[in-house]
Amino acid sequence: MIPIQLSVFFMIIYVLESLTIIVQSSLIVAVLGREWLQIRRLMPVDMILISLGISRFCLQWTSMLNDFCFYFNFNYVLCNLTITWTFFNVLTFWLNSLLTVFYCIKVSSFTHPIVLWLRWRILRWLPWLLLGCLMITCVTIIPSAIGNYIQIQFLTMEHPPRNSTVIDRLQKFHQYLHQAHTVALVIPFILFLASTILLMASLTKQIQHHGTGHCNPSMKAHFTALRSLAILFIVFTSYFLTILITMIGTLFDKRCWLWVWEAFVYAFIFMHSTSLMLSSPTLKRILNGKC
């Protein structure tokens, strides 16, 4: 049990972090959206960033509402928000993975025929890849939608079933949903991890070839991408730690430690959002007043 004053302090920190992330996401969407309206085209990385900005904007608002409903025991509202949070959470994971794969293909110095083939075609495929992320997300949240519907029906029953067999089946079904949601996040994480390793290998190869004294555009591109990927790796790891804490949540009061953990996790998300903004040449040019 932590003091109420400390909980309030971390709650305020979490709200400030969330509002900052919302402003950052809004800025990404507004700036890149204006650029698209003016010139009727966007750089490929900006297409991913504007999709990620929209997803993260919706995710952050849903996350705030979800956390406060959990903390204050608004169970019925929580059930309705959970499916929305799950959708934008999975979509954000897939968009982040797509961004890392794009960086890996376009920035790496590998000359393997498969890499060259992908590098030539990924620009044409990008709109379809974004649509694919959306479709995969819709499919993967179907079990969660079914589970939330059952839970809402259970909460609204005037006389809930007391049969232990029914309750056990519901508990097993929720365990299955938890595992399905974890798998839906593990797959994009593996894609992200593979892309990161390949980029690191490419950077090492470049350093060995050119020496540490040279700083060509390719090296700068590597460092920019790896800066974003390093922070994103911390975010992914932090999120999996939250899943682990949820699984062993009987050891402590999750509601008591909610704001401490959320403030910790969203500090990394804030850093990643900032890094993403700096990784876009269009955003850097406009924000620096060089448009």
From Swiss-Prot:
Glycosylation sites: N80, N163
Bilayer disposition of the protein: Multi-pass membrane protein
Transmembrane segments: 2-22, 42-62, 85-105, 126-146, 183-203, 229-249, 258-278
Topological domain ranges for the Extracellular compartment: 1, 63-84, 147-182, 250-257
Residue stretches in coiled coil: none
UniProt keyword annotation of ATP-binding present: no
Cytoplasmic compartment segments: 23-41, 106-125, 204-228, 279-291
Single GO cellular component term: plasma membrane
InterPro entries with a match to the protein in the record: TAS2R
GO molecular function: bitter taste receptor activity; G protein-coupled receptor activity
Location relative to the cell: Cell membrane
Keywords, ordered alphabetically: Cell membrane, G-protein coupled receptor, Glycoprotein, Membrane, Receptor, Sensory transduction, Taste, Transducer, Transmembrane, Transmembrane helix
Subunit structure: Interacts with RTP3 and RTP4.
PANTHER family: TASTE RECEPTOR TYPE 2, TASTE RECEPTOR TYPE 2 MEMBER 16
Known role: Receptor that may play a role in the perception of bitterness and is gustducin-linked. May play a role in sensing the chemical composition of the gastrointestinal content. The activity of this receptor may stimulate alpha gustducin, mediate PLC-beta-2 activation and lead to the gating of TRPM5.
Extra facts: Most taste cells may be activated by a limited number of bitter compounds; individual taste cells can discriminate among bitter stimuli.
Family: Belongs to the G-protein coupled receptor T2R family.
Protein name: Taste receptor type 2 member 16
The organism of origin for this protein: Papio hamadryas (Hamadryas baboon)
